[in-house]
Amino acid sequence: MKLIIGLGNPEARYSNTRHNIGFEAVEALAAAFGAPFSKGKGKYLVAKIRHRGEQLMLVKPMTYMNLSGHAVVAAMNFHKALRSDILVICDDMNLPSGTLRLRSKGSAGGQNGLKHIIESLGSEEFARLRIGIGLEEKPQGGYSSFVLGKFSTDERNVMNRTLEVCTEAILDFAVNGISHAMNHYNKPVS
């Protein structure tokens, strides 16, 4: 069993924002399998899919991004998941738009959702998939206005293709492990 956690903010006003690309990733995978989200045993929504004999629990924390660790711990406890079973998906403004970066462990790198998960788990030892949202220069309104901003039409086109590849990367992780997925998907989406 794998726990695939897409990070985002739960309110409708955050829909289609750069910061919610993690939600979009798990939503795209759930849609591809026709799996609906329902309330989990904690502050999260969950959809269940099966791929090549592997069960995947797709999780959307219903806490704000900066408190994602609470939902992750609740989901891990309920589903009896180990850190090696989880993949956390989030935005990364330091990666070019449309670039995927899988890692088996590491720091938060300035991503507050990851930071809270690391604090809550007491460890950086879990896989993550960062999706580049392409900050090219310091935004006038500050970093939070950038990540909480909506995608432009051009950005949305790039993200739609990126989400297709992201779905493949998640399934590869679930079946073949993080090292295999890293070797195949750590590159810009073309």
UniProtKB/Swiss-Prot annotation:
Would you kindly state one Gene Ontology biological process term found in this protein's UniProt entry?
protein quality control for misfolded or incompletely synthesized proteins
Q: Give me the reactions it catalyses.
A: an N-acyl-L-alpha-aminoacyl-tRNA + H2O = an N-acyl-L-amino acid + a tRNA + H(+)
Q: Where is the active site?
A: 19 (proton acceptor)
| PANTHER family, A to Z | PEPTIDYL-TRNA HYDROLASE
Q: What does this protein do?
A: Hydrolyzes ribosome-free peptidyl-tRNAs (with 1 or more amino acids incorporated), which drop off the ribosome during protein synthesis, or as a result of ribosome stalling.
Q: Report the HAMAP family cross-referenced here.
A: Pept_tRNA_hydro_bact
Could you identify this protein by its name? Peptidyl-tRNA hydrolase
What species is given as this protein's source? Chlorobium phaeovibrioides (strain DSM 265 / 1930)
